[in-house]
């Protein structure tokens, strides 16, 4: 949880917030995507997190990728902006959010995937055809669905 969100939660508890987030989906040359098994809800997801005060969206996405997966993004391409009712989510700890998420696609990065900060239990590349949407973290299912639908053009 980001510093800004942590401080906000101290004041408002679990009350619903609009959470602005930035994320990166890493895709290798075989069009496999890197996902991590989240330690909070035990679902698969890509790297991402809340934007800090005065932080640029791209900088947040890159920071989250490095913190969660140990990778340094070299090139980013805007993929999608995820928002709406499907992003409304209650975390296992009771925090309620309505996400506005800016997602980038990254095909060039530096480093080897590693579980850096403990937010992920496992990291793994998935062929898009083998992904079971029921095992994807609920607020990002629309993004993964779109990724699967557009795989041939990426």
Summary of predicted features, one role per range:
Residues 19, 39-41, 46, 73, ...:
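Short connector loops at helix/strand junctions that flank enzyme active sites
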Residues 26-27, 35, 106, 125:
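Conserved hydrophobic "DFG−1" position in protein kinase catalytic cores
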Residues 82-112:
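Active-site-adjacent beta-strand/loop module that shapes the phosphate/pyrophosphate-binding cleft
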Residues 103-107, 114-144:
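NUDIX/MutT-family hydrolases
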